[in-house]
């Protein structure tokens, strides 16, 4: 007979246990991609994550006291900035992992709900992170395919538990596409790119690392993110401290050829759109099952970053200012990125999750050989 108890995480040792549970649960999985351990630590630590400027959180562990053993975890998060922006009183749940035991999953969700209710929240939603830059959604389609480092992976029994709990309903779905890199740039993109260059004086802009980091262009990219994504599901405007963190963590590591900007020649070459890609880390991280960089993990990642030792590229971020969306700026971005993908020998591109309702973004893939191969869901229940 199991004896499931839920305990709050209150120490650094407890946080290490919270993080470790994921690696234990997914050890040996062919599809899960181990997250970088230091990245998890920085995200979940109050003294390291700038999101705690406007968020509060509590982490919980499920313990089977009859063994004893950790059998589940959950993070309860209140993003006060997002709640104010969208006029909601929501507590989010994330980092939600558990063994195939309905008592475990239900008690973890109850703990998150109780914590939120004590703080005046009226809804429980998730899986979500602190902000939209964190992993979101529970995988409900494409579970038997390799994941990526940027999204959640979960076992098939996860959504079955959510269905069994009944109080939860669908709040939002995200779709993911796998795209075959074409041998030549599709005529739709090539012709449109040529047309808008001459018609609207929009041009592709490549950057040096100095221009991006020291020159401030990377911050401009994230300012476009704030403007482009502002009306998307529960999006919260990124703060300057968050932007600085993303520049340090990701942009500094990026291959400059895989970052494409579009500028308006009629407006002092103002940046109006961008696309950011990274070589896929999936294979390298799967060989490094524990999420640690040492002793050999960093060499595998470096080989991918510098030598492009993978046939897949991840299209991580793309954005165009609203007033330029109907001027074909996306065609310029894709035409340039496809050229760079050819240069490095990439055969496949993984597009990051897009809202099911975002038909404009999804319509782009009709001009390429693509398949919608994953779907993930966010759930909601009243408290």
Residue ranges and their predicted role:
Residues 125, 178, 261, 276, ...:
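Short beta-strand segments
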Residues 22-64, 74-84, 206, 212-318:
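A conserved beta-strand-loop-helix scaffold within acyl/acetyltransferase catalytic domains
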Residues 1-32:
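Generic start-of-chain signal for non-secretory N-termini
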Residues 2-4, 152-232:
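Acyltransferase donor/substrate-recognition loop-hinge adjacent to the catalytic core
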Residues 83-167, 291-367:
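Acyl-donor binding region in acyl/amide transferases
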Residues 130-132, 182-184, 210, 280-282, ...:
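Short, solvent-exposed loop/turn segments at secondary-structure junctions
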Residues 57, 172-176, 374-378:
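Short hydrophobic/aromatic beta-strand or adjacent loop that forms the aromatic wall/cage
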